[in-house]
């Protein structure tokens, strides 16, 4: 079992119940899933780029990503409907907790010029979205084997009803928000 999951069950539930006055343990917000998305627009010109992106995402997430395709043709971007333009992976359960642990303890501290995560990136329903500019902050990525530095979006979906509850939940997991 991941350390963060144990921490959630042992201390976070009690803290949030006391802070927000929940009457049932089931009302306490929890992390439902983490979605990683990597847009790879260059894949239109070179098919090899997508293979590298999928390989990197597989190493980071621990499971094979789904290749996303263009929904409609856009002449300005030289893409047609059905062209592969990215990949995404949804983590739940044990893999989600392990990824969250690596993100908070290892990856975020390795971000260059890091001054804290923006607290304004909540969506109004307690979900948090963040962008990562370089995939090399993750220890699974070997710097010598990457073809190009790529970023990705990380969305943490919670069962929280408000941003305040979502922030309290992520604060309990030691997310480094700006003060």
From Swiss-Prot:
Source organism, top-level taxon: Bacteria
Disulfide pattern: none
Family, as annotated: Belongs to the universal ribosomal protein uL5 family.
HAMAP family, per database record: Ribosomal_uL5_B
Signal peptide: none
SUPFAM superfamilies: RL5-like (SSF55282)
Annotated GO biological process: translation
Record-given protein name: Large ribosomal subunit protein uL5
GO MF, one example: rRNA binding
Keyword set, alphabetical order: Ribonucleoprotein, Ribosomal protein, RNA-binding, rRNA-binding, tRNA-binding
Entry annotated with the keyword RNA-binding: yes
Organism: Shewanella oneidensis (strain ATCC 700550 / JCM 31522 / CIP 106686 / LMG 19005 / NCIMB 14063 / MR-1)
InterPro entries: Ribosomal_uL5, Ribosomal_uL5_bac-type, Ribosomal_uL5_C, Ribosomal_uL5_CS, Ribosomal_uL5_dom_sf, Ribosomal_uL5_N
Function: This is one of the proteins that bind and probably mediate the attachment of the 5S RNA into the large ribosomal subunit, where it forms part of the central protuberance. In the 70S ribosome it contacts protein S13 of the 30S subunit (bridge B1b), connecting the 2 subunits; this bridge is implicated in subunit movement. Contacts the P site tRNA; the 5S rRNA and some of its associated proteins might help stabilize positioning of ribosome-bound tRNAs.
One Gene Ontology CC term in the entry: cytosolic large ribosomal subunit
Subunit structure comment from the entry: Part of the 50S ribosomal subunit; part of the 5S rRNA/L5/L18/L25 subcomplex. Contacts the 5S rRNA and the P site tRNA. Forms a bridge to the 30S subunit in the 70S ribosome.
């Amino acid at each position: 079992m991941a350390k963060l999951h144990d921490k959630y069950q042992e201390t976070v539930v009690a803290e949030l119940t006391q802070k927000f006055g929940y009457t049932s343990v089931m009302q306490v917000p929890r992390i439902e899933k983490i979605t990683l998305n990597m847009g790879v627009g260059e894949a239109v010109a070179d098919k090899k780029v997508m293979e590298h992106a999928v390989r990197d995402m597989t190493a980071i997430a621990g499971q094979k990503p789904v290749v996303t395709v263009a929904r409609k043709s856009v002449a300005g971007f030289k893409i047609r409907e059905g062209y592969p333009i990215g990949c995404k992976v949804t983590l739940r359960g044990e893999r989600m907790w392990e990824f969250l642990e690596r993100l908070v303890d290892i990856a975020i501290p390795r971000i260059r010029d890091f001054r804290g995560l923006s607290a304004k990136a909540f969506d109004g329903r307690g979900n948090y979205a963040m962008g990562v500019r370089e995939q090399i902050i993750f220890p699974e990525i070997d710097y010598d084997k990457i073809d190009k530095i790529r970023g990705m979006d990380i969305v943490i979906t919670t069962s929280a009803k408000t941003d305040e509850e979502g922030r309290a939940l992520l604060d309990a997991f030691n997310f480094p928000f700006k003060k």
